[in-house]
Amino acid sequence: MKASYLETLDRIKDEHAEMSKHVNQQRSDIEKVALEKENMNRSYMTYAEVSNTLRSDLRKAEEINKRLQEFIMQSLAPQLSQDNQANCLAALEAFKTASPRENGNGAPALPPGFPPGAAGMLGMMPNMPFGMSPAMSQLFNQFASPHVNGGDGAGGSSGGASEAKKAKLEDPDDGELEIDVTNDDHPSTASNGGAANKNGRDSTNSVASSGASTPSIASNSRARQQQQPLAGLQGLEQMNFLAGFNPNLLRQASAAGGFNFLNDPHAQARLAAAIGQIGSRPAYSFKIVDGGVPTPTSFPPDAQKGPGIPTGLKKKMELNHGEVVCAATISRDNSRVYTGGKGCVKIWDVKESDISGATVVNRPPIASLDCLKENYIRSCKLFEDGNTLLIGGEASTVALWDLTTETKTLDLETDSQACYALAMSPDEKLLFACLADGNILIYDIHNKVKVGTLPGHQDGASCLDLSKDGTKLWSGGLDNSVRCWDLAQRKEVAKHDFASQVFSLGCCPNDEWVAVGMENNYVEVLSTTGKEKYQLTQHESCVLSLKFAHSGKFFISTGKDNALNAWRTPYGASLFQLKENSSVLSCDISFDDSLIVTGSGEKKATLYAVEY
């Protein structure tokens, strides 16, 4: 009897567990259906707005046509002779039945001057949903999405980024920046830009993404402009558009379709990428002069070759740090690599045989420096003699370490929750620290005192770099701005505003260009002397680190799309792209431009030899 009773209880428990499982599954399905319904409602509202705009424009055109006919018939025709009146009336009747071919258009309902291959272009004709190719349908969806028009729809993906590694941009109650690092999941396959996330994760550009493997930066900024990624327009490679069509058609499209092309440079870049091709691949570099419309960049013949221009990388060492590597640097003589993770900096020995050998070397570190009390390290700066290391991260202090004795010699107080980036003056006397509260602190390293503050960023200061002569400091922030500071006067002398948070920044050694990596997947190269800039679109997720070669001829950028891209300075011709297995969080280039090190969410750093 007792055994039967226990068996009955076990069966009831099993049935209850099974029912709970089904209930949870149904609840999950209901949430997914609700999300899909919400997305469908947003899409419906977008299409309804487009339809209403087109109907309104059609009514306007009909009214204008009616008034013109009345004016001709009532005011002009009576002044003509009888023969001319008859000819005028006949011409008016002929105009009513004129075919598109007679009007000089290559396709029905296209405006004059539009390329024949552009039939069905967004917002240019009332009957555009009919007869559109799949590629054009996708292009329409890109421009009609709520993201493009400043909405907060959830239909956009990261344009091919690993969905398990989206940046987590949270908004904590305390108003401070929050850094969170979790382990990487297995990378997922790339998804099309503009498609809904199939695994339930939010876009990299959303305010509350989850599952990040990268140290994420949470901000108290509520007004985040969300940008639709440029990458992922599948099928556009097959479209035979003319690259040099009349730019005034952008204004016609903006007026006819209700889309804000002229005030959204990213929408302009997407349109330019769709219709302008360079060689056999879609355009990925765009030149913008004085805030104008982005145009595909024309590269010189030697853009991807020549002395000092790399052709690729060869893996030489794998440095298994054991934690997510948020900072990495190479010593001046290439004999050491320093990697920063959670609570420690590890030092790795690099031998000439490691670089010249044919096999990938994997060995333990020669030393480990315990620092920042189990907080993640975000920046390491090595003195030129290789004996002193500055360490900053998710702590209120910046640590100074003597590497000869492997002891900490100084803690510099920042009065902030975190320090995201460090830079030193050329004479190594001054230290500059980017802080979570938006300030940039200046320390006298030798006298061990704070000597100044550069206030200006309205949100966390995330990155900085010095000009080669040390007179100018460039900083980027989560307030969507890049600022230039005159260090002699210690005041802001220039400011550049963007549509996205700035995550990384680097100054070209010739002091003519500054490259900026952003949360919206773009790299922008700004001229320090003129009004032109280049916009580069190869990344499929946010750009986390950026570094110029010491020659100034090229620079590299890394991101949450697991990619390392090498670009020609300044116009961004792609030299090569390398994919790792996880988000690439940090990078450095050796002083002689022969080595590159990357730190990743795979809890390791990788040392590469640069091939020329």
UniProtKB/Swiss-Prot annotation:
It comes from the Eukaryota. GO terms for biological process: chemical synaptic transmission; negative regulation of canonical Wnt signaling pathway; negative regulation of DNA-templated transcription; negative regulation of transcription by RNA polymerase II; regulation of axonogenesis; regulation of synapse organization; regulation of synapse structure or activity. Residues 150-159 have a biased composition (Gly residues). Residues 153-196 are annotated as: CCN domain. Keywords: Developmental protein, Nucleus, Repeat, Transcription, Transcription regulation, WD repeat. The keyword Transcription regulation applies. Residues 143-228 are annotated as: Disordered. Gene3D superfamilies: YVTN repeat-like/Quinoprotein amine dehydrogenase (2.130.10.10). Belongs to the WD repeat Groucho/TLE family. This is Transcription factor unc-37. It comes from Caenorhabditis elegans. The gene is unc-37.
